[in-house]
Amino acid sequence: MPQVDPELFDRGQFQAELALKASPIAAFKKAIRQAREVLDARFRAGRDIRRLIEDRAWFVDNILQKAWDQFDWSEDADIALVAVGGYGRGELHPYSDIDLLILLDSADHEIFRDSIERFLTLLWDIGLEVGQSVRSVDECAEEARADLTVVTNLMESRTICGPERLRQRMLDVTSTAHMWPSKDFFLAKRAEQKARHHKYNDTEYNLEPNVKGSPGGLRDIQTILWVARRQYGTLNLRALAGEGFLVESENALLASSQEFLWKVRYALHMLAGRSEDRLLFDHQRTIAGLLGFEGDDAKQAVENFMQQYFRVVMSIAQLSDLIIQHFEEVILAPEDEAPPQPINSRFQLHDGYIEARNDNVFRRTPFAMLEIFVLMAQQPEIKGVRADTIRLLRENRHLIDDNFRNDIRNTSLFIELFKCKIGIHRNLRRMNRYGILGRYLPEFGFIVGQMQHDLFHIYTVDAHTLNLIKHLRKLQYTQVSEKFPLAAKLMAKLPKPELIYMAGLYHDIGKGRHGDHSEIGAVDAEAFCQRHQLPVWDSRLIVWLVQNHLVMSTTAQRKDLSDPQVIHDFALAVGDETRLDYLYVLTVADINATNPTLWNSWRASLLRQLYTETKRALRRGLENPVDREEQIRQTQSAALDILVRGGTDPDDVEQLWAQLGDDYFLRHTAGDVAWHTDAILQQPADGGPLVLIKETTQREFEGGTQIFIYAPDQHDFFAVTVAAMDQLNLNIHDARVITSSSQFTLDTYIVLDTDGDSIGDNPVRVKQIRDGLTEALRNPADYPTIIQRRVPRQLKHFAFAPQVTIHNDAQRPVTVLELTAPDRPGLLARVGGIFLEFDLSLQNAKIATLGERVEDVFFITDAHNQPLSDPLLCSRLQDAIVEQLSVNQEPDIKLSRISI
């Protein structure tokens, strides 16, 4: 800390200002304000961050000393002002808590009570954020014995004012000789760290990470130092290196990583104007600029900054694992430790952990750097890797070069890992954590720490990839197979399950390289297969899966699965049932590994329907596609049979059906046709809109709640309907809009509640929805189609230009309008209003919300029920949608192509 820094705090000038004023508060506030401005300016100028946070602690020391001197403490008084916690370490960020201990010799505080209260009141009045406790030495011992946090804070202490002897006595009575021996302290801190990591989903890669508490954050470094201090006395990172826990290169890496996080934390506090350790979207872009990160645009700069952030915290997590493992071996070593058990000539088992038998194993036999992970997968009883061996792996990974990558021993070992019955994910994750995976597969190294700046992808690309492999492995577990029955069944019967793991490893490997990542990844996957000498059939399947890993989810979410042509085209693209099985399992794992909130009952039912219909088409033969007329006849025959058995007059049925048109029978099952028909025929002529709600278990709509609406057609009907559903907190996932020849609308919506589940059989909720829709649709002209709602905080930070693509469907007489736009409350109602303005009819819609963006597909016709044919009209329509959805967006809106 500096001894003198007049720019930051001029003691003489401050003393003079105190003397001039009746109250000291103004002088203190002025000094604090000026110091903050000086330090912030130094930060913006790029001053050394370690010096900055030490300078702030030095400044606060001076302020506290001056405040302490305002009160009458006798020179030999048994009272001291002690800095504890982070402030005790001499580290203070702009709005960090200033933790103080007012330490007394005796538990009798009465003699000092008035002065202590007035001192603390002064600190609050001048604007210092202090956390204070008033304790005697004995009370410190009592509190510390019962509370891990208290003893930890007291270990990091400095005397600011008063006699140092009190703090020394306090340190003595709270030492390992009296409480918290190093073994107990280590076990408690390790458990505390595990609980903290679990709070942050056990990943360094949260979208809005906590710089202090997340895995790989500043708290992990502090945990290392706390354990070391309890075991060895006063230590810092350099002293840890001296004790053999760190080599010099690791010490330098840990120190530079700590300084990077300090910069981020300092910037967070400065920008937020308060204590803030969450790296929120609100601040990521600004901090990227402050720290000098650049890119082709602001989004790229943020992604570059966050990639650096994630690589830094991953380095900290790696070294934290290494040091904690080292502590465990030293602190928890049993007195009667059993001798190591040989595994082979290169490795042995030491207290349940694998270790190299000598320091030259990896240098002399580099293939052992892959063999160690295969051994752990083959022998799951191995707990992990000894600390010295982790260090040897890190020190020798530079030996992984092109010769290593092409050595048949190494390629064979890597493939062997994928054939192990268990441990694939765990050991790939270890390989990534120790820096081996990215060296062996340089293309994988490129995606390490690569974040996509959106709400859809909540993990970095490497974390998502390993997560996908984890999901594939979990399909073997009973509790998981119950949630994903079809995927688990198919996974169990895949002829070569190792191939889906390899495809999973490569499916997103092409991201971040400015092109179609599926195509780029397929090229990399093919090179991988050739280098590892995989058979032709295996190679072709892996490459095909990587190239087409998005096709199934895209088809399920964006195409009309009731259209036989859609199923036929998808079946043609897949080709055979084996590929279909692999693709379905990969797709399920991919969605769940991308973002847990993406998987819901509706998305599951869409994929299952597409799988089942495609399998049926493949078994029937691609040369024999389903005939539309035959499908209509089958649906009508089955529905009529249900109705007649229920006592409905066939003549009434035929009369109604004659008004509905072919599309209605193509889009609905026989059961739904019978359900709708029966309700419509019983509806009084002046009974108002008919609203039916069903928790359906039919294959086509399984997992969603079906809402069927029958009412006289009006121009603004769709806009009002979706606005009313928005007010009812319903998420629309599918819309099927049909107008009968008698000008009645027959609309079917598949909805989920906001939690992603179907409505269920809750009669109160069903009645609320039915009544709300009926009331809104009784007088559509009186219902506001656009209802203002607050945009969620996170969505505000992902503005991008809406994109609209318009083209005519090759198989059906409709125009397809594809919309990609930022998700906003009331978006569908706004689109419906534009369709109304342009005199367009909506025939069908597929609605998908992916994080902060919507990817919706609308099937529309003109006023004459024909596809759009006027390019000028399409251009105006496109401009209107972009303009309407760009309110409060960035001005550089790009229009997408139009093809008619």
From Swiss-Prot:
Gene3D superfamilies: Beta Polymerase, domain 2, cca-adding enzyme, domain 2, Nucleotidyltransferases domain 2. Keywords: Hydrolase, Magnesium, Multifunctional enzyme, Nucleotidyltransferase, Repeat, Transferase. Its cofactor is Mg(2+). It catalyses: [protein-PII]-L-tyrosine + UTP = [protein-PII]-uridylyl-L-tyrosine + diphosphate; [protein-PII]-uridylyl-L-tyrosine + H2O = [protein-PII]-L-tyrosine + UMP + H(+). GO terms for molecular function: [protein-PII] uridylyltransferase activity; phosphoric diester hydrolase activity. InterPro entries: ACT-like_dom_sf, ACT_dom, HD/PDEase_dom, HD_domain, NT_sf, PII_UdlTrfase/GS_AdlTrfase, Polymerase_NTP_transf_dom, UTase/UR. Residues 1-342 are annotated as: Uridylyltransferase. Modifies, by uridylylation and deuridylylation, the PII regulatory proteins (GlnB and homologs), in response to the nitrogen status of the cell that GlnD senses through the glutamine level. Under low glutamine levels, catalyzes the conversion of the PII proteins and UTP to PII-UMP and PPi, while under higher glutamine levels, GlnD hydrolyzes PII-UMP to PII and UMP (deuridylylation). Thus, controls uridylylation state and activity of the PII proteins, and plays an important role in the regulation of nitrogen assimilation and metabolism. Belongs to the GlnD family. NCBIfam families: PRK00275.1 (NF001366), UTase_glnD (TIGR01693). Has four distinct domains: an N-terminal nucleotidyltransferase (NT) domain responsible for UTase activity, a central HD domain that encodes UR activity, and two C-terminal ACT domains that seem to have a role in glutamine sensing. This is Bifunctional uridylyltransferase/uridylyl-removing enzyme. It comes from Pseudomonas fluorescens (strain Pf0-1).
